[in-house]
Amino acid sequence: MDVPEEVEKHIKITEEELSSAYLLLENGKLRDSISRAYYSMFHAAKALLLLKGIDPRKHSGVIRMFGLHFVNSGFIERVYAKYLTHSRSDQRLTMMSITNQVMRKLKTLLKVLSASWRELKVFWRRLKMDKKAQALNEFLKL
């Protein structure tokens, strides 16, 4: 599978996981919702890394490389890296119990994730439509 196909695959998974997270939350399936929210963010981060030719194999590598290449460069706000890191921790915690604090964090996380997902989709569409690959070249220079 070449890079654009792999990126498309992760974008599709991101969209599916985000949709599932909302549906599960609306139906009171909190643990599953937190897990799906985390995987949505994970696959979005993985897609961005693949665009730069970076392919970490572990979740910890995706989180670390996402921070290094996108947050530290200023391309993505630091708060998004925190959401990704915290959602991974929350996902692990929810296997034990659900608290009101986790529930509030999840609702906030889903709102932020929806906004950042819309931004990623707009960026990806622009990237695909640019026949001269100017957007890709600018992106890779970050």
UniProtKB/Swiss-Prot annotation:
It comes from the Archaea. Disulfide bonds: none annotated. Belongs to the UPF0332 family. This is UPF0332 protein PH1297. It comes from Pyrococcus horikoshii (strain ATCC 700860 / DSM 12428 / JCM 9974 / NBRC 100139 / OT-3). The lineage of its organism: Archaea, Methanobacteriati, Methanobacteriota, Thermococci, Thermococcales.
